């Protein structure tokens, strides 16, 4: 891949999957902006890219749970944007946590913040002429159709994993709804990076980690045989961001570097993308919900 002259934004690019995505894009010659809550945390990666003679890498402040922060980032952007990788996320907050706007924190960070960022950068993406949005979702969406009636768990018991799945279904539906931008030369696709141990698990308690089989009785964490390294997990993100094989492809869901099969609720086979996450009517409804929520906030 030669991405010389291309400009990319990677949210949550200071560590884990995001850092590996940044490394790959910069190595191909792209100018990469790491959008992160703590820009100083990205400094080692910035210096690493400079020492390697890769594309320019720099960091800017962005808090996806704060609409003002997202708006500030988008307003400050100058020039076209070729690649937007919506990589940042949080998972399984143990207690119901709300933003100052009253939004459930996982939905706010994983979906609403990225929706606000993409819409705020729409003109920059359009001006690139052939831009790509890459959304990192999760297999957690499979059993969780988006709950339009109570997305913030105001009237039902809070469940950390249901909230996470809710946000990840929203991520996939966003890419389906983004087909409205195809005439602007913008494509959007989602992906499941697979099982990987990163800082994403920082809110998961030891009991759950043991139940998942990734922590022993002494508290030692180790991946299971089917777990990927962060570099392996980032491969599909990089494919969607840069491969000419994906020119013009939009509204699809990928895993392991290929388009995933569609599964219906109740399918017990691992992997795939749920039909409820590809529903165009739900995608349009979610787009309207996102726009209304942001305008009210």
Curated annotation (Swiss-Prot):
SUPFAM superfamilies: NAD(P)-binding Rossmann-fold domains. It comes from the Bacteria. GO terms for molecular function: oxidoreductase activity. PROSITE patterns: ADH_SHORT. It comes from Streptomyces lividans. This is Probable oxidoreductase. Substrate binds at residue 138. Its EC number is 1.-.-.-. Coiled coil: none annotated. The active site is at residue 164. Keywords: Oxidoreductase. Pfam families: adh_short. Belongs to the short-chain dehydrogenases/reductases (SDR) family. NAD(+) binds at residues 9-33. The keyword Oxidoreductase applies.
């Amino acid at each position: 891949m030669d991405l010389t002259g291309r400009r990319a934004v990677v949210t949550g690019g200071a560590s884990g999957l995001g850092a590996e995505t940044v490394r790959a894009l910069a190595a191909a010659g792209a100018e990469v902006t790491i959008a992160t809550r703590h820009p100083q945390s990205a400094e080692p990666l910035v210096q690493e890219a400079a020492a390697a003679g890769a594309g320019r890498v720099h960091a800017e402040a962005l808090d996806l749970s704060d609409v003002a922060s997202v708006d500030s980032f988008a307003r400050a952007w100058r020039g076209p944007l070729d690649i937007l990788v919506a990589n940042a996320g949080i998972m399984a907050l143990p207690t119901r946590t709300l933003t100052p706007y009253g939004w459930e924190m996982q939905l706010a960070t994983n979906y609403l913040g990225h929706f606000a960022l993409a819409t705020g950068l729409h003109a920059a993406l359009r001006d690139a002429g052939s831009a790509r949005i890459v959304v990192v979702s999760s297999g957690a969406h499979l059993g969780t159709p988006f709950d339009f009636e109570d997305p913030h768990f105001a009237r039902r018991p809070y469940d950390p994993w249901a909230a996470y799945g809710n946000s990840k279904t929203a991520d996939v539906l966003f890419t389906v709804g983004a087909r409205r931008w195809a005439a602007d030369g913008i494509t959007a696709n989602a992906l499941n990076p697979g099982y990987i141990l990163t800082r994403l698990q920082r809110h998961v308690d030891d009991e759950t980690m043991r139940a998942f089989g990734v922590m022993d009785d002494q508290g030692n964490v180790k991946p299971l045989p089917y777990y990927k390294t962060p570099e392996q997990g980032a491969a599909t993100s990089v494919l969607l961001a840069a491969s000419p094989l994906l020119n013009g492809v939009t509204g699809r869901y990928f895993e392991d570097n290929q388009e995933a099969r569609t599964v219906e609720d109740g399918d017990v086979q691992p992997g795939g993308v749920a039909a409820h996450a590809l529903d165009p009517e739900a995608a349009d409804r979610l787009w309207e919900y996102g726009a209304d929520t942001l305008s009210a906030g």
